[in-house]
UniProtKB/Swiss-Prot annotation:
Official protein name in the record: Kinesin-like protein vab-8
MF annotations from Gene Ontology: ATP binding; microtubule binding; microtubule motor activity
Family matches, as Pfam families: Kinesin
Basic and acidic residues biased stretches: 883-897
Compartment(s): Cytoplasm, Cytoskeleton
Cellular component aspect of the GO annotation: microtubule; striated muscle thin filament
Polar residues biased stretches: 938-960
Subunit: Interacts with unc-51 and unc-73.
UniProt KW keywords: ATP-binding, Coiled coil, Cytoplasm, Cytoskeleton, Developmental protein, Differentiation, Microtubule, Motor protein, Neurogenesis, Nucleotide-binding, Phosphoprotein
Organism expressing this protein natively: Caenorhabditis briggsae
UniProt-listed SMART domains: KISc
Amino acid sequence: MEACTSKSSLLLHSPLRTIPKLRLCTTISSEDVAYGRCNLTDQHLQIEGKNYSKNTFDHIFRTDATQDDMYSAFLSDMINSVFAGNDATVLAMGAKANGKDERLYGNSVSRNGLIQMAITQLMNAIDDNKDPEERIQVRMSAIMVSQKDSSIVDLLSPFNDPRHRVVKLVDDARTGVFLDNESEIRVETIDQALFYLNTAVDHRLIQDEQTHRTSHVFISLSLYSYKMGDKMQGGRRRLCFLDMGIGERNSTNGGMTMPALGSILLAMVQRNKHIPSRDSSVCQLIRCALSTSRFTTFLFSFGSKNDDNENIAHLACKIARTRVKSVMGHGRKPSGTFSSGTMDSNGSSSSFGTTTITPGGTPRTQRRFELESGSELSAAETVIFLGPSCSRTTSPASTTMPSTPTSIRPLHRTTRNHSGVDPVSKPLSVETKSSPTHNCHDGCIHSIPPMLRGHTPFLSPHLKLYDELCSPPNSSCASPVLSAPNAFGGKTAERRDDFGIMIAQPHIPLMKAKSKYNLDDGKMKQIMQWMETSEAPPILFSSPCYENSATSLDELRECVGILSHPLEDIIEQEEESMRTSTATTGGSKKDHPLRILSKQDLNIDSEAKDKDETELELVMAASLSSMRSHDILAKLEAMRNAQSGQNGQNGNIGTSQSNTDMDVSEMDMYRRASHLEEYAMQRVREIEDNKMKNKKKVKLGLNCCQQQSMISSGSTVVDWSQIERKKEREKDAMEEEKRKEVLRERRAKLKITELEIKRERNMIDKELDDKKGIANSIARQLQHFSLSPCRGGRTHRSVSTHRIDPPNASLPSTPTMSHKKMIGGSLAKLSASGASGSGPPSSPSLGYHQSLPRHSKLPTAVNGRRSSAERDRKTSKNSRNASSKERRSSGSKEELQWRSPYAQMTSPKTYGGPGTSSSGRGSSAPGSDFETPVVSATEKTANGTMPRSKRQSYSASSGYESANDYHIYATTNKKANILEKKRNEEKLFLVRQADEIRHRQWQLKKELEEAKRAIGQEEDAKMIANSSDQRLNGLSRTTMVDAMLQENRILEKRLIACRNHSMLVTTFI
């Protein structure tokens, strides 16, 4: 498919008139084709069964497309754009898939990802197009942002920032969005850049799918260029790679989803003022990547989720429609290929140079009149300094700006002539230096690659003082100055090693350089001895090199210089040291404070100054972190003034510094002063420690007197309250440690107990695994188990099932002799069976899972009650018939001469006295309490008379008593009969309840014995089988019933626990 054809964005005077170039690309992997996610036809791209126009994308890379095809399609033009002075961004968006990772980072064999190819071609283009008047430096940074917790991680901080400063995304109304405290590491070779890239990529490739969705990696390659000549110009261009995830699957977790990320990208492409989720870290990262970009390429890829692929396709279509509207709104038609140029005031375009780079060819670059910067368009990343200058003369031609075409956009410049003399220009000498070798570097930074041994591209320049003291300028280097200086390498005029590039003054004789530091041999030896032997206080810093037992003094010294510098807040941490010097004439010292260029400086009239000097204009394009330079320089100036006042009082230091013939740069002076200050603090600490050791212990009551005497004598006062507080803190710490020790012991005991429990469980599991028969029996039994409390038929009902019984179900029948005999016999049988361990023949089946009841209730079924009632009625009827027959056969013939076939004669009974008698239906009832022997007709009384004849009933009602005697029975024995009946009912109820409870207890024991045997506890099963209830003998019926109910509850709980355990084991098996 043809490349994206839109006219190149012209670099005009106003950045608002510049339209960023936008390309849309997509990749189709072999997995997408195999699973039917994407299919490409002649006119459509089918994604998840839906057709999309092929014109939506500028490039569609099939499965057979190589990395070189992708490079030639869009990456080469982006590198050309960077060399032309623009920022460029590649935004790769898609789910975690092998195709996406291979396109961006390459595989483990070829390692030909897009980022690797961009680094290689960029470094090769810099090496092949060197210019003696141009310095180019490449810096690399890698940031990862997680939208889950809004955290920002600097992936290269272990190589650049031992203090691990917090990286922030700052949204400034004037400068835009920028990264603060990010680690920008200078890379000089391809191997170094690939090493840092691999370190950053490792964090991305090891992420799981969910973490990949919610995290985004931002890798940038920044080109800092400086052009030397009559005027100095510089700037920064940036090539960014933004590897974005696709967000959360849903918004329930509070994270940003794919539509939310798409709305942010659309707002950035449309250049809307309102951007959704403006304060989120993800939105700020996207703004940081796209706000200054003049050339943006979207690279979409697809994953395994259908909805994610549809969202990506919809986003691509929206961006394509937005691009068409923006191009048509500005009156430009997509045509031509990418080029870069400028337009003059007449409308004619004048090309200032392009670079064509191919993966296999050599870049061809035409020289440009002036360097342009993509950061210059945003007017946010260039800081202009006016530093210490030297008196020089310039030519009249240099007082005015040389005539340049309107297409060239120079940076801010200021030319001031305070002396009124026509200056004569003198060219600057730009010397470069090679990086020194530090043997102590490995102790501070632990992740140095093998290729960087002996090289310190990222260390702070604070150690230059020590290096220069160890190697004085006249003896540190014997090699001559290189005739053809190389960018960021070589030797300086002072013949010593240094970091980076130095913009030096005109050549100074070597003899004057010897007195640079104004230190005699004694002071130098003292400083060297202190730096070799001193140890930094632990409260100032905590360095990882001490944790790894760094024994070298060089390692300790370098860690002290980096991490515990007293003035580190006013010294900028950079890899190269920008050193400036001033030349003096006539032995007079010129004092020129550092300041930042402002509008007030531009408006000052050159004739208002009385000083005979001309300041040298140094313009340097700095990174965004240099925006703090205003505060830094203000602090530096204040401390320099304070130091000059102290030098006036101190004669030794003031004399040694006033006799110098050459000014020392402010940076070196304050480095030296910081070391002396640290040395003084160390000495004070040692003196105080010695005094504390030599001080004798005194009584507590004399502390105040001694303190006053010490104040009066002018000696050092010891703060005893602080010492007491320190002791209290130590005591509290010891108590806390003791409490922790007790907790540790408890935790150890708990661990031992836990191990024993696990060992027992393992033994049980092992036994169950060895005995397959037990497992099979448990499985067969569990087939009848039920988790519900009411499962099964009428014959299998749970104990906890609450049933509403009929009101007469628990009422006893009329107590007769036959009933008493039956009850006595049943009790005797049950006691005998309970003692022998045997039970009734019909026991309930073990076929249901029994839950723990809330309260115990006797299980009485309706069928059982009905059968027992019928059985009682049949028994009472049979007993009545038998007794009636016996009485009829054994009745006295004297008493009954004849009998009616329709009535039954009842024997009279005496009650209430000898003269009262009655007969009725209650007198013939067998087992009655009122039954008496029959009186014969021949029996006589004591006086020889016959007893009064008892009235006998021969009526058809069979035993109705006469009305004359009934009232006597009702009034005399009614209360006694009711009380006796209640006692009998209570006794019978207790007997029945005890019988049923004992029967239930026997069932529970049988079931518990079987459950114990099923889980392998044979001893417990034997104990349960041999247990008896002889211990309850001798107790009252009520106490015995309560005790048996409590035992039944315990047995139910044990049975439920055993069944649940067997079910758990069977489930695991």
